UniProtKB/Swiss-Prot annotation:
HAMAP family: TruA (MF_00171)
Residues the entry annotates as binding substrate: Y109
Source organism per UniProt: Natronomonas pharaonis (strain ATCC 35678 / DSM 2160 / CIP 103997 / JCM 8858 / NBRC 14720 / NCIMB 2260 / Gabara) (Halobacterium pharaonis)
GO biological process, one term: tRNA pseudouridine synthesis
Active site positions, chain numbering: D55
GO molecular function: RNA binding; tRNA pseudouridine(38-40) synthase activity
Family according to the record: Belongs to the tRNA pseudouridine synthase TruA family.
Keywords annotated in UniProt: Isomerase, tRNA processing
Catalyzed reactions: uridine(38/39/40) in tRNA = pseudouridine(38/39/40) in tRNA
EC number in record: 5.4.99.12
UniProt protein name: tRNA pseudouridine synthase A
Gene3D superfamilies: Pseudouridine synthase I, catalytic domain, C-terminal subdomain (3.30.70.660), Pseudouridine synthase I, catalytic domain, N-terminal subdomain (3.30.70.580)
Membrane-spanning ranges: none
Length: 267
């Protein structure tokens, strides 16, 4: 078995998990493996599992997949068949019993929240993160009916006009990070009092205008997945390919932002 670290720009995909309609990261990965002649059983490589399922528009730096891979399959070889927006960059040989989903002890997400001062208060945002950290039933922060009890930590730092929010837990329910960030943003902007978070963490469901909608997916990144005892070896050529591809995309988006800023008619 071999585990691979995968980075991808999720903006052009309908999520990570394979589906029959619409391009997903997993679809692209399986097509690449098929082109390379990797064996499949029941539509996937033997032993295949992934660390998590990111939603449409969400990106990743450390998505992790593992399966029975031939000895010659290095990240650089995988990149030769993957689209440019998906880059393998490290790998680790793991035991036959390794499972990329179940063996992960922690997952870390990072959200880049556009929240310039003074419209968003950093002190209020930090207080909101502290209130949401710990062990809670987050049933009001996810559409899931089960698996809503989680223990997590939230931290943030200001980076210019952005609040960078880091969320870490053993696992996350659907939309949990994005709804947590939306709640933090509402407190930071003065749209909700800090006491609202206590209500959101109570047993009673929130309804109507009190409901918490998910923040947009595009600013969210799966930053890390932790596997104790597993040491990933960076493929230098593959990592350089990833840096080049994503640096180019960054420059293009900076240019796109300048164009968007110039669209308003003159006053």
């Amino acid at each position: 078995m071999r585990a691979f670290r995968i980075a991808y720009d999720g903006t052009g995909f309908r999520g990570f998990q394979r589906q029959p309609h619409g391009e997903t990261v997993e679809n692209a990965l399986f097509e690449a493996l098929s082109s390379l002649g990797v064996a499949f059983e029941d539509g996937r490589p033997p032993g295949y599992a992934a660390a998590g399922r990111t939603d449409a528009g969400v990106s990743a730096r450390a998505q992790t997949v593992a399966f029975e891979a031939p000895a010659w399959l290095l990240p650089r070889a995988l990149n030769g068949e993957l689209p440019a927006s998906v880059r393998a960059w490290a790998a680790a040989d793991v035991g036959d019993a390794f499972h990329a989903t179940h063996d992960a002890t922690a997952r870390a997400y990072r959200y880049f929240l556009y929240a310039p001062e003074p419209s968003a208060d950093t002190t209020r945002a930090r207080a909101a993160c502290a209130r949401l950290s710990g062990s809670h039933d987050f049933h009001n922060f996810t559409p899931d009916d089960r698996g809503t009890e989680r223990t997590l930590s939230m931290r943030l730092r200001r980076q210019g006009p952005f609040l960078v929010v880091d969320c870490r837990a053993g696992g996350f329910a659907r939309q949990l990070v994005r709804r947590l960030v939306a709640a933090v943003a509402a407190v930071a902007r003065g749209e909700r009092p800090l006491s609202f978070l206590g209500r959101a963490l109570d047993d009673d469901p929130l309804s109507g205008a009190d409901g918490i909608a998910a923040a947009p997916p595009e600013p969210l990144l799966l930053a890390d997945v932790v596997y104790p005892g597993v040491e990933f070896t960076v493929d230098d050529r593959a990592a350089e390919s990833a840096r080049t591809v994503f640096a180019t995309r960054r420059r293009q988006r900076l240019a796109d932002a300048r164009v968007a800023g110039a669209l308003s008619p003159p006053e």
